[in-house]
Amino acid sequence: MRNYLKYLMLFLAMTFSYSVLAQSVQWRDQHKVKRKETIFGIAKEYGVTIPQLLDANPAMKQAGYELKKGDLIFVPYSKEGDFLPDGSVKGKTDKKAAAKSTVAQAPVKAVNAIRVGVMLPLHNQDGDGKRMVEYYRGILLALNQLKSEGITTEVHAWNVPKGADIRNTLLEPNASKLDIIFGPLYSEQVKPLADFCRAYDIKLVIPFSISGNDVETNPNIFQVYQTEASLTNKAIASFLERFQKSHHPIFINCKDETSQVGEFTTSLRKQLDLQKVKYNLTSLKSSNADFSKHFDATRPNVVILNSEKSPQLNEVFNKLAQLKKARPGIAISLYGYNQWFVYQDYYLDQYFKYNTYIPSTYYYNKAADKTKELEAKYTEQYGEPMSRQYIPRMAITGYDQAQFFVRGLKANGKNFKGTAAEVKYRPLQTRYDFVRVGQGGYINDNFQLVHFKTDQTMENLVY
């Protein structure tokens, strides 16, 4: 890995609103409407008032609204209550929770509890809200697990949708008492929240992609997102470290006019030129004979596509299959893109067959026992599985982040710097290892190659 750092340094050197009330609604659960249920009955079941239920679900206030079987209803907590790690409310009896568990309610705040805040669009009005609901549920599952180890938390969650003035949320009395906040989702909300966290010495975890450079000046920020430019640099450096001296690179033109990976392939070719590494160019439109002549018979070949999409990848697999049939002794590896994880259910055998490497910051391993266990708990707790639409899985992202940061705060308190060495936790999907940006905050520096080996096993090569 020492050479990886050398290559990375060399490359771097060379180169909609809701009302104010709705914006701060806090809710604790999501209820799936059953046949013949009424708004009154649901409110009574959870110990909330009908107006509180309506405020948490603005669609209910629209003229002509009818409660239908299968609708998802957001359940707020009553005003005198607070979230517990299991999503229940202090001072209120939740019939569903009572039926599931014999754990006693905690009427008073736990001593030395880590106070966790979540400020995200927690609603079911659009894709952003649904993703963040799943992410938040993952956080709750993590905090439940930590509770079994004696790590106590208090959770305060606010629905902060797009267009909301987050400063209104920050007026809530519990906000300034938090130890850590996860959020926001939208870039325009970052600065006021970051300034607030700095003023009250609260750790701020920005979990998803944002624009802006607040992390460069605010020491309370932990920014999970890495820029595309940074990830491209790391992907190129790891390619050079692993393949430059041992493999023959071949670039395949996929004729994809909407490709999103052109910057990577162009920059990689420039670096190979500077390093005086010979490579070949071919195309999916080439004849089999012309395609074959670009592959070296005396050393391994590494193939790079200029497209991240599934149809083009499938064409490449067909082309390589014909090549291997004609020249079975040819050694081939693929260097891909994290979008390929989405197609894993269809192409897994091909990934193994062609010794595939995928540069990424995460890997969703659905075959892992721990992953299966968490997915089963999620379904049991929330009555539905995690969405298959998202990779990385949103709930597992929330789970990993909560585990990492709460453990880090428990062990190190305010001195927690976000390094992997400070936290004894093996993530299910995403590793975290933060580095400081000057005198500002911290950015996740984790990077890995996920290697699908020809013996049908896998390895994570962490840089």
Locate each region found by the language model:
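Extracytosolic ligand-binding ectodomains
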Residues: 2-8, 23-52, 56-463
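Short, linear, compositionally biased motifs with a strong N-terminal bias
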Residues: 11-14
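N-terminal signal peptide c-region/cleavage motif recognized by signal peptidases
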Residues: 17-18
